[in-house]
From Swiss-Prot:
Lineage: Bacteria, Bacillati, Bacillota, Clostridia, Eubacteriales
Enzyme Commission no: 5.6.1.7
Protein name per its UniProtKB record: Chaperonin GroEL
BP GO terms, sorted: chaperone cofactor-dependent protein refolding; protein refolding; response to heat
InterPro entries the UniProt entry points to: Chaperonin_Cpn60_CS, Cpn60/GroEL, Cpn60/GroEL/TCP-1, GroEL-like_apical_dom_sf, GROEL-like_equatorial_sf, TCP-1-like_intermed_sf
């Protein structure tokens, strides 16, 4: 395919136009008085959102050079979302500001490589200073504040704080759509996995269609059980003790299933069978997790164990097990606490070592089931459009809260960026172009406050000067149009979000400035086939 080429200033300006189109679309959403953007969808109703990365992902421009610029800034938003889960609008805004100021200097004859050196130097210093002013998150109140600022809702803030308090730092919190109008929180205590009973005849409560087993033995195996003779010895031992049994296996079928159901219906013996969770190697690991949690052993051919040789001490135990059509929950497994801690540490190491986001997510779920718990925030709304918008806001707030717990919080509303400007201004260099790069970051750090003020109908430049004149930590409360101590008022941003937004914006923008040529495909023209003879309108009456 043939290519079109642009060089120097023309290439940079064409790409900058794309950067501006994307960033100008996203920037209107920043701050407590930011607006929403409507995204057209091929199927279903349009999506209304103020989530920067969601908006950025939808933007594809017709001009190939403009599109290149837009895609580069889209990467800033995506990377920030991957690392911190929030701050994508701020990152986009910073990238635009660095590119705009940088191109002015490059056009005036400055060396882009030296400018990039200055930008990197300034960002390193900025990140250092952000960490210095960072404060750790203390308790439920701080968590609620972070979530409330991100979601622009105090109710959501309280909900997320409740969820984090109940499942702990190792817990997993998921956001799902609710069938009702309200938004509520459901916390699953104990270990839950998505497998239900193999036969409805095994239920103990026919009204709720669930089986609840108290003080229960748990047989864990990766084998398929079809012959009752295989498990008869262990069944006889359990019957003698008058206990109940949960069997977790690859499957229960044939004679084994019918015998267990028959004994349950006769009232001789209560046993519930469920299929093992997961697939392949992940299944083996999950069965081992259950075994450690309950103090049992996995009966597996790989380990040279046979079902006929199972004894009572190989079984797991738990205070209670609840089995529904779709889920099994094990509460208060009687496993050895030291063994559980060792398993948790092992999973943490695997989380740090893995590069796959999917694997990391699955490992985090396993960790939560062993060490914390699982909370589900069910989001409800009157219409599907409102539901999607609400869900995106809660997901952002949840990510921001987790980031805050990890690295702490700084004054919000762009105040942290303003507070570190004097430290950036102190940086010097003998090379003029490096000094220009430092100045570019110094100016760019004003941009978030300017945009928050503009979106609130105030004059950005005036607000910036007033914030600079106040003591550190005091910023502009755009919602109430006044200057307040941001930390005391609860207007805070996660340190991780503030830091990664600047780092990612500077990384892409400084590389953008070094562009000297751009190459794009020339779209091929579609050759319309000639009209066949007689297909015209001539001769018709």
């Amino acid at each position: 395919m043939a290519k079109s080429l642009l060089f120097g200033e023309q290439a940079r300006r064409s790409m900058e136009a794309g950067v501006d189109k994307l960033a100008d679309t996203v920037r209107v959403t920043l701050g407590p008085k930011g607006r929403n953007v409507v995204l057209d969808k091929k199927f279903g109703s349009p999506l209304i959102t103020n989530d920067g990365v969601t908006i950025a992902r939808e933007i594809e421009l017709e001009d190939p050079y403009e599109n290149m610029g837009a895609q580069l800034v889209k990467e800033v938003a995506t990377k920030t979302n991957d690392v911190a889960g929030d701050g994508t609008t701020t990152a986009t805004l910073l990238a635009q500001a660095i590119i705009r100021e940088g191109l002015k200097n490059v056009t005036a004859g400055a060396n882009p490589i030296q400018i990039r050196t200055g930008i990197r130097k300034a960002v390193e210093k900025a990140v250092e200073e952000i960490k210095v002013i960072s404060k750790p998150v203390n308790g439920k109140e701080d968590i609620a504040r972070v979530a409330a600022i991100s979601a622009a809702s105090e109710e959501v803030g309280k909900l997320i704080a409740d969820a984090m308090e109940r499942v702990g730092n190792d817990g997993v919190i998921t956001v799902e759509e609710s069938k009702s109008m309200g938004t509520d929180l459901e916390v699953v205590e104990g270990m839950q996995f998505d497998r239900g009973y193999v036969s409805a005849y095994m239920v103990t409560d026919t009204e709720k269609m669930e089986a609840v087993l108290d003080d229960v033995y748990i047989l864990i195996t990766d084998k398929k059980i079809s012959n009752i003779q295989e498990i008869l010895p262990i069944l006889e031992q359990i019957v003698q003790q008058g206990k109940k049994l949960l069997i977790i296996s690859e499957d229960i079928e044939g004679e084994a299933l019918s015998t267990l159901v028959l004994n349950k219906l006769r009232g001789t013996f209560t046993c519930v069978g469920v299929k093992a969770p997961g697939f392949g190697d992940r299944r083996k690991e999950m069965l081992q997790d259950i075994a450690i949690l309950t103090g049992g052993e996995v009966i597996s051919e790989e380990l040279g164990r046979d079902l006929k040789d199972v004894t009572i001490d190989m079984l797991g135990t738990a205070d209670s097990v609840k089995v529904t059509k779709e889920n099994t929950t094990i509460v208060n497994g009687k496993g050895d606490k030291v063994a559980i801690k060792e398993r948790v540490s092992q999973i943490r190491v695997q989380i740090e070592d893995t590069t796959s986001e999917f694997d990391k997510e699955k490992l985090q779920e396993r960790l939560a089931k062993l060490a914390g718990g699982v909370a589900v925030i069910r989001v409800g709304a009157a219409t599907e459009t409102e539901l999607k918008e609400e869900k995106l806001r809660i997901e952002d707030a949840l990510a921001a809260t987790k980031a805050a717990v990890e690295e702490g919080i700084v004054p919000g509303g762009g105040t942290a960026y303003i507070d570190i400007i004097p430290k950036i201004a102190d940086l010097t260099s003998d090379i003029i172009d490096v000094k220009l790069g430092i100045d570019i970051i110094r100016k760019a750090l004003e941009e978030p406050v300017r945009q928050i003020a503009n979106n609130a109908g105030a004059e950005g430049s005036v607000i910036i000067e007033k914030v600079k004149a106040t003591e550190a930590g005091v910023g502009y409360d755009a919602l109430n149009d006044k200057y307040v101590d941001m930390l005391k008022t609860g207007i805070v941003d996660p340190t991780k979000v503030t830091r990664s937004a600047l780092q990612n914006a500077a990384s892409i923008a400084s590389t953008f400035l070094t562009t000297e040529a751009a190459v794009a495909d020339i779209p091929e023209k579609e050759n319309t086939p000639p009209m066949a003879p007689g297909m015209g309108m001539d001769g018709m009456y």
